[in-house]
From Swiss-Prot:
GO terms for molecular function: channel activity. GO terms for cellular component: cytoplasm; mitochondrial inner membrane; mitochondrion. This is Mitochondrial inner membrane protein Mpv17. It comes from Caenorhabditis elegans. GO terms for biological process: regulation of mitochondrial DNA metabolic process.
Length: 181
């Protein structure tokens, strides 16, 4: 209970930094679970660090700004407004956001920009198509019921499981990375 009160106070006073810390923690935990479920012999700390860093320093700030921009979309009919926001989110933001995550994740794996781009082209469509089976429902709940400062957190709670999937899909063995560490 004390931790919930602490988080509520932090979200009221410093929403971005609080959301960044929570996002990094949840994302790192999701990667740990993905590694465990894939029966990795040894825990890859660098892999977990990459996911945590990307989530806290890129995803959380991007979503923080995005949800505030999405709030500026106005309309008289609540149902139509929800559909409008959902379409903007899933057809404009989500494809770009997924691409940026995949590209940056590969850069954090010490891939070249060219190799990162090639891997993005290889993985993007399947990941985006799968995201359309999950995130529209999450966003309906988010946009209808969740206060603005809590939306990134709800996304990250769902992203705990999504990141397990993303981690599994994107962490194909890469020979030269293993020798780098």
């Amino acid at each position: 209970m004390v931790i919930i009160l602490f988080i509520r106070r932090r979200l009221a006073t410093n929403p971005l930094s609080t959301q960044m810390c929570i996002a990094g923690t949840i994302s790192g935990s999701g990667d740990c679970l993905a590694q465990y479920l894939s029966h990795n012999q040894e825990w890859d700390r660098w892999r977990t660090a990459r996911f945590s860093f990307l989530s806290s320093c890129f995803m959380a700030p991007s979503l923080f700004i995005w949800f505030r921009l999405l709030e500026k979309v106005k309309g008289n009919n609540k149902s139509l407004l929800l559909v409008k926001k959902l379409c903007i989110d899933q057809l404009c933001f989500s494809p770009c956001f997924n691409a940026a995550i995949l590209f940056n994740l590969r850069l954090l794996q010490h891939q070249s920009a060219e190799k990162s781009w090639d891997l993005l082209k290889e993985d993007w469509f399947n990941i985006y198509a799968t995201s359309l089976k999950v995130w529209p429902f999450v966003q309906v709940v988010n946009l209808c019921f969740v206060p603005l400062n809590y939306r990134v957190i709800l996304n990250q709670v769902v992203a705990f499981f999504w990141n397990c999937y993303l981690s599994y899909i994107t962490q194909k063995p890469i020979d030269h990375i293993e020798q780098f560490y």
